[in-house]
Amino acid sequence: MVLILNIETATKNCSVVLAKDGETISIREIATQNFSHAEKLHVFIEELFAETNLKLQDLSAIAVSQGPGSYTGLRIGVSAAKGLCYALSVPLIAVDTLELLARKITIDNGIIVPMIDARRMEVFCAFFDANYNKIRETKAEIIDENSYQEISET
């Protein structure tokens, strides 16, 4: 049995998922306009394990969003994940937030451009091909209706 605790705190959403052999068995999440990661993250983790009657010691690994995203949110999620991994002697799996968003979409050809609010009128974005290979590195940029004109013309 492979049991992975998944932590996402890169955006205003705070979510924790417990997956067993690749299938979600329990989830807790909140999406608000205010960041509540510090208050909710550890409570959510405790609730998942109470609901499933599993123990932290049953974990095979912990996966955490590595960003890009909210600096404070990422620090909260990564710190919690690293602390648990150290205490439990399990591997830490860092996952690219934009790649996760890209993998929610299936295309035969073309480019996937996931974006996350970077504040100050900017977005974090990267380009992925249909096989989810990153073809342009992550950047924070201000976009407008003409920002990706050269891509849409190809």
Provide a role label for each language-model segment:
Residues 45, 80-84, 102:
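Buried hydrophobic packing segments
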Residues 9-11, 72, 97, 154:
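Ser/Thr-centric signal marking residues that sit
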Residues 23, 91-154:
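Surface "functional belts" at beta-alpha junctions
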Residues 61-92:
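DPxDG-like acidic metal-binding loop motif
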Residues 50-57, 86-97, 107:
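Phosphate-handling active-site elements
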Residues 12, 67-68, 118-121:
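Short glycine-rich anion-binding loops that position phosphate/pyrophosphate groups of nucleotides
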Residues 32-40, 71, 75, 79, ...:
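Residues at secondary-structure transition points
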Residues 1-66:
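N-terminal beta-alpha supersecondary unit
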